[in-house]
Curated annotation (Swiss-Prot):
Disruption phenotype: No visible phenotype under normal growth conditions, but germination of mutant seeds is strongly delayed under low temperature conditions.
Keywords of the record: Acetylation, Cytoplasm, DNA-binding, Metal-binding, Nucleus, RNA-binding, Stress response, Zinc, Zinc-finger
Region named Disordered: 80-245
Name of this chain's protein: Glycine-rich RNA-binding protein RZ1A
Residue ranges covered by zinc fingers (CCHC-type): 120-135
Induction remarks: By cold stress.
Ranges of Basic and acidic residues composition bias in the record: 92-110, 129-196, 205-221, 228-245
UniProt xrefs under Pfam families: RRM_1, zf-CCHC
């Protein structure tokens, strides 16, 4: 069996049902095949989604690549390319690694009972990654979302404190209004003082002229009383010739 990489092709994107025989039937029309092999998983024995074919001449290999690359085989679009040469004895494992890197290893996309992905290293269950582990979320009591809620709660508290600050500001203005009210009271008391002065009930006491008007005259009689016919003399009346009038 020839291992010459010059005549060896890499076949990727194979269906799970494609077998060695099916691979040979698809490519033997382009030339004599030395080998047709679907690579299997060493643990499960299932197809890994890629394989190799080896021709005995370069012309057949080139024709197969040109004709079959991008064609349909067993319901799958396959890729056909020249296999990489052996380096350091890596052999077919090196080609297999290249197939996995190019997305031809179907084990990654094979359903595993979850949303896809490998096994979680936290709980050991398949179908999710460690960062999406449901056991981790339940242990944290909601995970990162609960901390997010707490952050918004603290934000609400901050705005509540802001409202309190504005409430205190309103109280300050209320106190200012009280100050002006007391000022108005002061002016009111001042007005009362002047009102008392005008109304006769002030600190200056009763009107002197009123006392004189309501008191006795110098002649001993009350003004307006019987016998009080004489005019009371005003304090500033000047004597005229012939006496007071």
């Amino acid at each position: 069996m020839s291992e010459d990489p010059e005549y060896r092709c890499f076949i990727g994107g194979l269906a799970w049902t494609t077998s060695d025989r099916g691979l040979r039937d698809a490519f033997e029309k382009y030339g004599h095949l030395v080998e047709a092999k679907v690579v299997l998983d060493k643990f499960s024995g299932r197809s890994r989604g890629f394989g190799f074919i080896t021709f005995d001449e370069k012309k057949a290999m080139d024709e197969a690549i040109a004709a079959m690359n991008g064609m349909d085989l067993d319901g799958r679009t396959i890729t056909v390319d020249k296999a990489q040469p052996h380096q350091g004895g890596a052999g077919r494992d090196n080609d297999g690694d290249r197939g996995r890197d190019r997305g031809y290893d179907r084990d990654r996309s094979r359903p595993s009972g979850g949303r896809g992905g490998g096994d979680c290293f936290k709980c050991g269950k398949p179908g999710h990654f460690a960062r999406e582990c449901p056991s981790e979320s339940s242990r944290d009591g909601g995970g990162r979302f609960s901390s997010k809620d707490d952050r918004y709660s603290s934000k609400d508290d901050r705005y509540g404190a802001k409202d309190d600050r504005y409430g205190a500001k309103e109280d300050r203005y209320g106190a200012k209004d009280d100050r002006y009210s007391s000022k108005d009271d002061r002016y009111s008391s001042k007005d009362d003082r002047y009102g008392s002065r005008d109304g006769g009930g002030s600190r200056y006491g009763p009107d002197r002229s009123g006392e004189r008007a309501g008191g006795r005259s110098r002649d001993g009689g009350s003004r307006g009383a019987p016998g009080g016919e004489r005019h009371s003399r005003a304090p500033y009346d000047r004597p005229r010739a012939g006496g007071f009038h």
